[in-house]
């Protein structure tokens, strides 16, 4: 299960070459993974020509990926700086957590009423992966599985709008954690994830909602005031621990337009 990439997303580009399409998908996936796993900091600058060179794609393809990332709130365009990894402000961070406090307690309440045994087992597998990552000191992997836990709850609720919303909120939460110097050791607590699933398993909707609210509050409380971020041109950070795979290994059975 450790080979599963919860951040791999399928996208389509107007490009005749399957190899080029696969490289574009790979570029998007690795940029998102690098942000989520805290490998790349808010303020990091993306230069079109550098990305094109790293991933062996055209600058047109790079622009499409950057435009999508901008729509998702993961990058921003700044005067004289160009495109950089977004750094949520204090108010934006507050908004992110307010939205999550409205959505996630409702999600776990719904799961208390209707959640299959398979979903419960899937949740526990994710928690196990997260715990093993913590024990091995693999901080980046622990962060990844922590985010996947929250997205998997939304997925189990079978509400497509919430699945999309939670995907965006968890990604933006990762940026907020970085921008606010939150420690990954005290943000998403593995034990709290287990307690939430136990409440769902026992169909205790009030306890599940209460535990989720407390969990989100603990994450927010782990943050300090936003710090000024410095931009960098070191895009090789994107590939730290994420070696470029062969484009032929990228799944392309179903694509989405940028």
Region roles according to the model:
Residues 1-113, 224-258:
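Short linear motifs at protein or domain termini
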Residues 52-53, 87, 171, 184, ...:
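Short secondary-structure boundary/hinge segments and terminal tails
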Residues 14, 18-22, 87, 94, ...:
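Charge-dense, low-complexity intrinsically disordered segments
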Residues 36, 70, 167-170, 201:
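Alpha-helix boundary recognition
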């Amino acid at each position: 299960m450790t080979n599963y990439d919860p951040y791999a997303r399928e996208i389509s580009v107007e490009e005749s070459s399957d190899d080029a399409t696969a490289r574009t998908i790979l570029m998007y996936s690795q940029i998102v993974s690098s942000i989520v796993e805290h490998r790349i900091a808010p303020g990091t600058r993306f230069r079109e020509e550098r990305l094109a060179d790293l991933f062996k794609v055209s600058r047109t393809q790079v622009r499409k990926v950057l435009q999508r990332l901008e729509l998702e709130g993961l990058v921003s365009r700044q005067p004289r700086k160009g495109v950089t990894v977004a750094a949520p402000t204090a108010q934006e961070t507050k908004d992110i957590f307010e939205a999550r406090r409205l959505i996630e307690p409702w999600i776990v309440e719904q799961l208390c009423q209707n959640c299959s045994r398979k979903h419960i087992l899937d949740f526990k597998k994710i928690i196990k992966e997260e715990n093993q990552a913590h024990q091995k000191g693999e901080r980046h992997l622990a962060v990844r599985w922590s985010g996947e836990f929250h997205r998997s709850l939304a997925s189990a609720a079978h509400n497509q709008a919430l699945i999309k919303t939670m995907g965006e909120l968890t990604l933006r939460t990762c940026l907020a954690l970085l921008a606010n110097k939150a420690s990954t050791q005290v943000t998403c607590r593995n034990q709290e994830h287990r307690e939430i699933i136990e409440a769902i398993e026992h169909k205790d909707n009030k306890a599940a909602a209460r535990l989720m609210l407390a969990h989100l509050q603990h994450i927010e409380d782990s943050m300090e005031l936003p710090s000024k971020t410095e931009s960098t041109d070191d895009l090789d950070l994107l590939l730290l621990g994420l070696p470029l795979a062969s484009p032929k290994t990228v799944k392309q059975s179903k694509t989405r337009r940028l």
